[in-house]
């Protein structure tokens, strides 16, 4: 197909080995690791090919909420510099949505969509579905992330120490009068 290069088996193997080695170094001996880097969606084809055993979980959330959360979060990573311009965030988010649609079409049944709002409204039900999808045994600790004491390397370190709660997807609405319609672009999503 146009724009597709042949798969280089050596490069895939090298990527796989380097990535798994890096995970082992950071995982403190854990066998299950979540890599939640914001740009991961760009590499789902590579991940699916080089790491066929990997589960791809796509957390879907209100577009306006995602854009606002990115805009108001300080990221030390230079690759997230687009987060300091609302126009750049909106453009980036459109690209993200287009690429995720492509991945869903290119890899049917390979990506598990987890609806953020549904998770906050029906935590146990949605968490049980996710755990079942992953083929893991249920553990009641899944319902109490605030009690987990292991280290977590994330910009949202404070959030992962809190109970699952509703309302964060509405936070942007407090600032709507000052955004001059910037997030209205996602009108179907912003009710």
Give the location of each predicted region:
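PAPS-dependent sulfotransferases, especially Golgi type II membrane carbohydrate sulfotransferases
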Residues: 3-28, 70-113, 120-191
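Glycine-rich phosphate-binding loop used to anchor ATP phosphates in small-molecule kinases
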Residues: 18-48
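Short beta-strand segments
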Residues: 32-37, 55-60, 113-118, 131, ...
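Acidic-histidine catalytic/liganding microenvironments
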Residues: 37, 51, 107-108
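Short, solvent-exposed loop/turn segments at secondary-structure junctions
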Residues: 38-41, 62-65, 73, 117-121
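Short hairpin/turn module used for nucleic-acid contact or packing/dimerization
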Residues: 41, 54-56, 64-66, 81, ...
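Short N-terminal helix/helix-N-cap motif within the alpha/beta-hydrolase-1
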Residues: 42-45, 68, 124
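Conserved phosphate-donor/acceptor-positioning beta-strand/loop module used by diverse small-molecule
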Residues: 47-71
